[in-house]
Amino acid sequence: MKIISRLNKKNKNVYGDNTDYIGFAKIYKKLVKKNVNKILLIGAGGAARSILQFLNDEKIKQVDIFTRTLNKKKILSRTMKFDNFYIDSKEIRNKHYDLIINASDAGMLGRKNLASNIYKLVPNTSFIIDIVYNPLRTNLIETARANNVPNDGG
């Protein structure tokens, strides 16, 4: 996968592994109880790349990636070679997604919230996953709960 999120030292050697992929896979398999075809992934950093790899391994048909950072968008499109991904930083293509994933720092304590157009999508979404861990109940999770949309995160 070529993405490391944790380093371990053993017998004077350093090993890297990826907890983002494993952690997301557990949440996804616990929460998502039906096939999903259209996913909105918010973010384009290291965690988002791990999640993209998982989604590709699961053979998801369509993933729209929404990112505010043009440089990360360029890096992501250059390093992740999948044909079912659409990347934009200005608009969201669909009004309905089976799953919305926040893999950005938006909503994290001390950071900006997600763009308001994201929250408007929640009532028409089947599942929400927000990987932000502080606070555990982000505005996205609270919006999902208020609309009775199954959700998980952290």
Language model segments and positions:
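Conserved S-adenosyl-L-methionine
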Residues: 57-62, 146-150
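Short, conserved loop/helix-junction motifs that constitute active-site signature segments
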Residues: 33-35, 57-59, 117-125
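Phosphate/diphosphate ligand-binding glycine-rich loop within oxidoreductases
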Residues: 1-31
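Glycine-rich adenosine-cofactor-binding loop
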Residues: 28, 36-57, 67
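Rossmann-like adenosine-cofactor binding region
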Residues: 83-153
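NAD(P)-binding Rossmann-fold cofactor-contacting core
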Residues: 60-80
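A general structural signal for well-ordered alpha-helical segments in protein cores
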Residues: 1-4, 21, 48, 73, ...
